[in-house]
């Protein structure tokens, strides 16, 4: 499995994202630039420039018409994917740590930082796609249609459940909350991870009925969107920054490594800078993929389950297209199921 090495960033990666078709990969880093790549061959399509600070997060609408980014310059920007122009800027009092489109792309959530006397919030913005020719994308609402304020512990990550019914948020204190997608009312809160070990990532299954969290407490959890029941736990030996669920095969991919500031040795083995594959059902680790020089900050998987990409503290994005053995590998019990 030879990786394609994408070097378009000068500083460490913050988030990477495949679009719904899987032909494009978007990456954002601490260097104020958004890159778009062809996922098949790693060719760079272009960049989106305009942010004045590190970009923490990126998401692309389900129809690949709009791209949203959230940055340390306290703005959310909306871009026209095709032309690269910025069609809208929303200003917030603090940095924006996570943006996510709902399943039909009609709404966008933005998680803001708790700073300078402002509480952390989750703002929901209504998105307008203009006419069929791609005109009128600039006509976006100026104010959020919904604002959820996190009074207890700030939200670090968030996403939408199936049908956009719930907003699921991961918090700094290791808990996971479920909010009503329409009213913003908190319905449920579960201490999913060790107290005070923040949740660094949350990614949903393809049907959004369950999701995976990655935490500083060295574990990842598979959780139901409906009632926040913890279904599975994947234990690693290093803090986790990112986790994703693979379609086609029942695996999950976890990315992490010692925090950059804690690294004392230069051996990549020592820092555990690998992407780890676990069996989704049996919770066993089944393999690792090495390559990054420094912690993995973000992982994402191709929507067809044919490839995955990881972005690291080293400023590189590595795209791996899976080989045949990856798809052939099965547990004995899975084989028996097939024979029946």
UniProtKB/Swiss-Prot annotation:
Chief localisation class: cytoplasm
Pfam families the record matches: EIF3I (PF24805)
Entry GO terms, CC: eukaryotic 43S preinitiation complex; eukaryotic 48S preinitiation complex; eukaryotic translation initiation factor 3 complex, eIF3e; eukaryotic translation initiation factor 3 complex, eIF3m; nuclear periphery
GO MF entries: RNA binding; translation initiation factor activity
Record note on quaternary structure: Component of the eukaryotic translation initiation factor 3 (eIF-3) complex.
Protein's GO biological process: cytoplasmic translational initiation; formation of cytoplasmic translation initiation complex
Protein name, entry field: Eukaryotic translation initiation factor 3 subunit I
Matches recorded under SMART domains: WD40
Gene3D superfamilies listed in its UniProt record: YVTN repeat-like/Quinoprotein amine dehydrogenase
Encoding gene, per UniProt annotation: tif34
Keyword Repeat: yes
Keyword field contains rRNA-binding: no
WD repeat feature ranges: 8-47, 50-91, 150-189, 194-233, 291-330
Subcellular location: Cytoplasm
Organism: Aspergillus fumigatus (strain ATCC MYA-4609 / CBS 101355 / FGSC A1100 / Af293)
Function in brief: Component of the eukaryotic translation initiation factor 3 (eIF-3) complex, which is involved in protein synthesis of a specialized repertoire of mRNAs and, together with other initiation factors, stimulates binding of mRNA and methionyl-tRNAi to the 40S ribosome. The eIF-3 complex specifically targets and initiates translation of a subset of mRNAs involved in cell proliferation.
This protein's UniProt keywords: Cytoplasm, Initiation factor, Protein biosynthesis, Repeat, WD repeat
